[in-house]
């Protein structure tokens, strides 16, 4: 079992393993599933008291899911709470309230932290890239009649860039933007010889999941870019690129995802050029 990287992933692991846990750990399971805000904000002592278990049981619970301690597990609850806060101002305030250490606040501090974190994320992307997956992704794009691209909310900028870049090649890219509330009408045109590129990160956009479900139902090939192998999008994918983005405080970057997308487009340009 791999360590969960999002709250949704952890909650699914807890539900899947619930029956195999001891009674004490089942007790903790029920509490953490039903009281996400408490786990995010409260101390270990308070959580243990409210769950009616010794603090050591919380540590055993975290260890059972491959965390080094309960505080490490708490981070998933805290970041999920922050991510569900739409306002960036409220998000920054929440993070300061939850963070015991000093939070970088000057523009230079924030720039340096993002630069450092993005550099690490890009190095990790290159180190973990699988040549066969990249080759297959480029070939799927080259063979497609039409390339449908789905990426909403914070993933929209990546989807829009991919559409823009592909429009400069001999491709037929279509951005599934749901303009005028017509997403269902847009995706109804997807056919078996098309490719769907879906981009979404936790918390996953329901509309993007709907696109993947529809594409699967008509037999279209799918390339997914997401943050977990158990992302709801991964189920429908022919190729799934798991990208770990840089994160500074409560804010995630998009540098690694954009790097991957740009690399695929440029590789496709070379591939199409060879065919002339």
Roles of regions detected by a PLM:
Residues 130-140:
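Short, acidic loop-to-helix structural element flanking the phosphoryl-transfer center
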Residues 136, 271-276:
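Active-site phosphate/pyrophosphate-binding segments
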């Amino acid at each position: 079992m791999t360590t969960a990287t999002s709250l949704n992933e952890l909650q699914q692991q807890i539900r899947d393993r619930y029956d195999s846990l001891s009674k004490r750990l089942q007790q903790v399971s029920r509490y953490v599933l039903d009281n996400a805000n408490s786990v995010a904000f409260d101390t270990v002592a308070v959580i243990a008291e409210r769950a009616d278990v010794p603090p050591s049981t919380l540590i055993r619970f975290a260890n059972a899911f491959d965390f080094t301690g309960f505080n490490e597990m708490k981070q998933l609850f805290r970041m999920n709470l922050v991510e569900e806060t739409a306002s960036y101002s409220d998000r920054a305030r929440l993070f300061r309230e939850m963070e015991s250490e000093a939070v970088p606040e000057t523009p230079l501090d924030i720039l340096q932290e993002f630069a450092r974190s993005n550099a690490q994320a890009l190095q990790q992307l290159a180190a973990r890239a699988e040549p066969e997956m990249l080759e297959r992704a480029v070939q799927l794009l080259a063979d497609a009649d039409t390339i449908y691209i789905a990426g909403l909310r914070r993933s929209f900028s990546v989807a829009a860039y991919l559409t823009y870049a592909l429009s400069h090649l001999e491709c037929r890219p279509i951005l599934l933007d749901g303009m005028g509330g017509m997403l269902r009408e847009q995706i109804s045109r997807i056919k078996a010889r098309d490719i769907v590129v879906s981009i979404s990160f936790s918390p996953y956009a329901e509309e993007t999941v709907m696109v993947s479900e529809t594409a699967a139902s008509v037999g279209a090939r799918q390339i997914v870019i997401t943050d977990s192998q158990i992302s709801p999008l991964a189920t429908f994918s022919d190729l799934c690129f798991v990208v770990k983005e840089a994160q500074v405080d409560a804010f995630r970057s998009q540098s690694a995802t954009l790097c991957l997308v740009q690399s695929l487009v440029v590789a496709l340009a070379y591939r199409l050029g060879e065919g002339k």
